[in-house]
Amino acid sequence: MKILFDTNLWISFMIGKRLASIKDVLCRHDVEVYVCEQLLDEIRIVISRPKFDNIIPQETRRRFFEMVYDVCLFTDITVDAASPIRDVKDLYLLSMAESVPVDYIVSGDKDLTELGGHKGIPILTYNQLIAILHQNT
């Protein structure tokens, strides 16, 4: 199963909220999680905001990126997605999803989840993904 996580889920993972089980997803041998440099750049930009200084320690950030580089598969964006999406900054995620192609886009962003899917690729919440993974266990 090929998966793409949106930035907000990665940030939640670093903060250690209920999405801590994302580590379990990353360690499954039937799951491949894809990232691209643009996604990692967006994560770096978000966590560099002052409000995260006291929430995500530098050591957590360092370990996070080490884990991503160790566990995730990197891809280039080779497709320019066109979609009626409110936040055009998210278009690169849809382009990346098409480029791989992934089986699922997983996001906590209502703008994306309300789309329901993009070019046959379902856009799920994290809880929906976990339900699918439990069915496949």
Where are these regions (language model features)?
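Short, well-structured N-terminal submotif of metal-dependent ribonuclease cores
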Residues: 1-35
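A secondary-structure boundary/capping signal
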Residues: 6-7, 35-36, 108-109, 125
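Residues that scaffold the ATP/ADP-binding catalytic core of kinase and kinase-like folds
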Residues: 12-13, 46, 55, 115, ...
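Residues at secondary-structure transition points
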Residues: 17, 34, 59, 84, ...
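Hydrophobic/aromatic ligand-binding patch that stacks against planar heteroaromatic rings
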Residues: 25, 96, 115
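PIN-domain endoribonuclease scaffold, especially VapC-family toxins
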Residues: 26-80
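Active-site neighborhoods of divalent-metal-dependent phosphate/nucleic-acid chemistry enzymes
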Residues: 70-105, 110
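Acidic, PIN/NYN-like endoribonuclease modules and their adjacent C-terminal/linker elements
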Residues: 100-106, 110-137
